[in-house]
A protein has these predicted regions:
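Cys-dependent protein tyrosine phosphatase-like superfamily
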Residues: 1-131, 135, 142-196
């Protein structure tokens, strides 16, 4: 369903609690004993909050171990069928922020999308949550940088973490993070996570 901000919300209320039938769904499930492979650029941001690039079917067993309730996806592209099937089978709420890549200087990050995503990230009822874009670098780096401002990190530490994932060409993103007004994010104080 689309809302007025252009965010697509996909909700599935089905959470498969039974044993998975590996032979009937080879796309979504690996067999027992298969290695757990994290998505590209995977990292834990805080307890119950993870970041990465776009997951693929080799990552599904790993993601299942996280017990995700929510996924926030920042990209223009829709999920491929195998990813859509996975989130439906697992009962994961997906918030799809239709956002262009912001590596180019003329592409701006959408302040409303970042604020909306931060409200969800700061609500422990959404946890565990995975935030991802295609490569887990620039768009997610901006979101994490804004989260770190709310956590009162120094700008030096925020930019060091950003460059760890995105590299050195970050001038526009640094400016976005630096000027983002984190005091205007209306999160629910009662349901804030313990790390805030």
């Amino acid at each position: 369903m689309d809302n007025e901000k252009g965010t697509v919300i996909i909700t599935s209320h089905h959470r498969n609690q039974t044993n998975h039938h590996y032979d009937t769904c080879p796309i979504c499930y690996t067999r027992p004993g298969m290695p757990l492979v994290p998505p590209l650029n995977f990292a834990m941001i805080a307890s119950g909050v993870y970041r990465s690039g776009h997951p693929n079917k080799q990552n599904f067993a790993f993601l299942r171990k996280l017990g995700l309730k929510t996924i926030m996806y920042f990209a223009m592209e829709d999920y491929p069928p195998e990813m859509q099937h996975f989130v439906e089978q697992e009962g994961i709420e997906v918030l799809h922020y239709k956002t262009e890549g912001n590596k180019e200087p003329f592409i701006e990050v959408n302040h409303e999308d970042i604020s909306h995503a931060l409200v969800k990230l700061l609500d422990k009822r959404s946890h565990p949550v995975l935030i991802h874009c295609l490569k887990g670098k620039h768009r997610i780096g901006c979101l994490v940088g804004c989260l770190r401002k709310i956590q009162r990190w120094s700008m030096t530490s925020i930019f060091d973490e950003y460059r760890k994932f995105a590299g050195t060409k970050v001038l526009a993103d640094q400016e976005f993070i630096e000027t983002f007004n984190h005091d205007q994010v209306p999160y629910d104080y009662e349901h804030r996570p313990g790390w805030l």
